[in-house]
Amino acid sequence: MKLKTLQLQNYRNYESISLNCHPDVNILIGENAQGKTNLLESIYTLALAKSHRTSNDKELIRFDSDYAKIEGDLSYRYGEMPLTMYITKKGKQVKINHLEQSRLTQYIGHLNVVLFAPEDLNIVKGSPQIRRRFIDMELGQISAVYLNDLSQYQRILKQKNNYLKQLQYGQKTDSTMLEVLNQQFAEYALKITLRREHFINELESLAKPIHSGITNERETLSLNYLPSIKLENKDKSETERLEEVLTILNDNMEREKDRGVCLYGPHRDDLGFNVNGMDAQTYGSQGQQRTTALSIKLAEIELMNIEVGEYPILLLDDVLSELDDSRQSHLLSTIQHKVQTFVTTTSVDGIEHEIMKNAKLYRINQGEIIK
């Protein structure tokens, strides 16, 4: 898939711009705080109907405006389609081919993106929340079913946590409701756990050879899914696995009542990375951690193509300067002539690669594109 054009109205520091995008590499050059990252963010927001930088949509609206609008014309192997997102101070509206979508699960997945920013280099050494978010962002784009299951799970999790707090403070004494919530909770927890497990296995199979290539076969990468609810026997039927999840939840019900919070479930999952059999988070050097992050991102691109039949759009937000020449070269060689890419940078000096010959450059200054 390719983004042919991008139009912004009243988005962040952009009053009104229209961008004709290059099908290969688009480089956004400018000093800091001019709007380069805002433009990249708008593409991400158009894809996922939310920003990766803020949970408050109002911040996306230009300071003197009542609304913001993002519109992109996309080309696929099978045709073309516009996507539109309106953001007001009361909410947001998304459209596919000019038709409003009542549910975000119907919308997400029509524009797939992979974001690689400096903070993504922390996927190895950062918090479990960062790794869970990475999993959910990938799976949510390639599987509407997963996105719906995750939404239902989060709804039930919120209900369960509220009820546990009420029990803790003596506002409720009937545990029957908790048993009902546990049944619903277990069903979605199992679906999410199994889908994440499959995803991690697929991602590992792609990341291993990539990591080996970057390190000239000196290192071997392995991924380790660390579910909060550990299922012992993988040969059991889904019904038996559901009973296993319920048993774990029921066995720990008193602990959860005492703590007033849900202690088990996919919201507490984690993902481990091993390099040459050693935990990369604890023992990996900064170089190994960065190579691991790069390998995972490149594997993410390939997996998305396998799952949906289209390469995603790659957003590189000031990350090339964070990579040494070898890793930078490997990244650019991998995406060349294959993945439409948007790059933000303060300068193209130091980007020595053939890919630059066909790149389209845009100079960004105070929310405007300077021709």
Swiss-Prot record:
GO molecular function, one term: single-stranded DNA binding
Subcellular location: Cytoplasm
Disulfide bonds: none
UniProt keywords, alphabetically: ATP-binding, Cytoplasm, DNA damage, DNA repair, DNA replication, DNA-binding, Nucleotide-binding, SOS response
GO BP terms: DNA replication; DNA synthesis involved in DNA repair; double-strand break repair; SOS response
Keyword Cytoplasm in annotation: yes
Top-level taxon: Bacteria
Alphabetical list of InterPro entries matching this protein: DNA-binding_RecF, DNA-binding_RecF_CS, P-loop_NTPase, RecF/RecN/SMC_N, RecF_2
SUPFAM superfamilies the UniProt entry points to: P-loop containing nucleoside triphosphate hydrolases
Residues reported to bind ATP: 30-37
Entry's Gene Ontology cellular component terms: cytoplasm
Family membership noted in the UniProt record: Belongs to the RecF family.
Role, per record: The RecF protein is involved in DNA metabolism; it is required for DNA replication and normal SOS inducibility. RecF binds preferentially to single-stranded, linear DNA. It also seems to bind ATP.
Name listed for the protein in its UniProt record: DNA replication and repair protein RecF
Name of the gene this protein is made from: recF
